[in-house]
């Protein structure tokens, strides 16, 4: 059985790590480099660097910061925000990214997923899917959650898999930053219907939530920010807790 992964996420804006609630009300969460160094030594399996305002402001990801982080960490680094072309993906890889995360640009041009996958391999392409519950449906949103799309979450998940995505980063906008637990309903629905790994995101508030994301949501990895950035828990604590409950993790 493949080990489940714990992935801290650096949401970056104006050169700092930030964290909000429901994609709003951003709070400073420290220095990018200090947080990256901390997680590199903390048993994190991977690290995600998301320039959360790049797509909203129609600009490139802050690649200078990406390069600095890549020189400090020796775990897989996923970079997202403003990856709107194969050229920008290439730039991210040249600055130390191991994977790129696409979201807004993939909705506008779904073929972008295929183009990046063909050039760099599916394993290097993560498609971030931000979902919000509207009535009984989970609707995909873009531009840092500001704009609803025509896609329902399950439909889009299947489409990106066919286009060559190697992984899905599924974020519940309703749960983001609330510390109320992952939305394991949509998480399970998508995780059990696609054949690529799904990363749970949005809502982790304690170690039991991580466990539930794996046990109930069938996630392959759990992404979290608030509980780790503000040192509520260490990743070592999280992995020990999970292992004691039968979840296979690397320690």
Swiss-Prot record:
It is found in: Cytoplasm. GO terms for biological process: L-histidine biosynthetic process. Pathway: Amino-acid biosynthesis; L-histidine biosynthesis; L-histidine from 5-phospho-alpha-D-ribose 1-diphosphate: step 5/9. Pfam families: His_biosynth. GO terms for cellular component: cytoplasm. The active site is at 11, 130. Keywords: Amino-acid biosynthesis, Cytoplasm, Histidine biosynthesis, Lyase. It catalyses: 5-[(5-phospho-1-deoxy-D-ribulos-1-ylimino)methylamino]-1-(5-phospho-beta-D-ribosyl)imidazole-4-carboxamide + L-glutamine = D-erythro-1-(imidazol-4-yl)glycerol 3-phosphate + 5-amino-1-(5-phospho-beta-D-ribosyl)imidazole-4-carboxamide + L-glutamate + H(+). Its EC number is 4.3.2.10. InterPro entries: Aldolase_TIM, His_biosynth, HisF, IGPS_HisA/HisF, RibuloseP-bd_barrel. It comes from the Bacteria. SUPFAM superfamilies: Ribulose-phoshate binding barrel. Its main location: cytoplasm. GO terms for molecular function: imidazoleglycerol-phosphate synthase activity; lyase activity. Heterodimer of HisH and HisF. IGPS catalyzes the conversion of PRFAR and glutamine to IGP, AICAR and glutamate. The HisF subunit catalyzes the cyclization activity that produces IGP and AICAR from PRFAR using the ammonia provided by the HisH subunit. PANTHER family: IMIDAZOLE GLYCEROL PHOSPHATE SYNTHASE HISHF, IMIDAZOLE GLYCEROL PHOSPHATE SYNTHASE SUBUNIT HISF/H IGP SYNTHASE SUBUNIT HISF/H. This is Imidazole glycerol phosphate synthase subunit HisF. It comes from Prosthecochloris aestuarii (strain DSM 271 / SK 413).
């Amino acid at each position: 059985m493949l080990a489940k992964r714990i992935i801290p996420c650096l949401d970056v804006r104006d050169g700092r790590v930030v964290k909000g609630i429901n994609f709003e009300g951003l709070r400073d969460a420290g220095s990018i480099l200090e947080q990256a160094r901390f997680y590199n030594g903390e048993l994190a399996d991977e690290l995600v660097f998301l320039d959360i305002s790049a797509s909203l402001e129609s600009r490139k990801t802050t690649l200078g910061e990406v390069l600095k982080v890549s020189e400090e960490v020796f775990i897989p680094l996923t970079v997202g925000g403003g990856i709107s072309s194969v050229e920008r993906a290439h730039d991210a890889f040249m600055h130390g990214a191991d994977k790129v995360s696409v979201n807004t640009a993939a909705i506008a041009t779904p073929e972008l997923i295929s183009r990046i996958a063909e050039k760099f391999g599916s394993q290097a392409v993560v498609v971030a899917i931000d979902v919000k519950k509207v009535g009984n449906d989970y609707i995909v949103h873009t531009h840092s959650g500001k704009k609803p799309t025509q896609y329902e979450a399950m439909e889009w998940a299947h489409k990106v898999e066919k286009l060559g995505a190697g992984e899905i980063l599924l974020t519940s906008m309703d749960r983001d930053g609330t510390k109320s637990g992952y939305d394991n309903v949509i998480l399970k629905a998508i995780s059990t219907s696609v054949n690529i790994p799904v990363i749970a995101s949005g809502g982790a508030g304690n170690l039991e939530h991580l466990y539930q994301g794996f046990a109930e949501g069938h996630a392959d990895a759990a992404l979290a920010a608030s509980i780790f950035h503000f040192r509520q828990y260490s990743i070592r604590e999280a992995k020990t807790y999970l292992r004691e409950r039968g979840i296979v993790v690397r320690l």
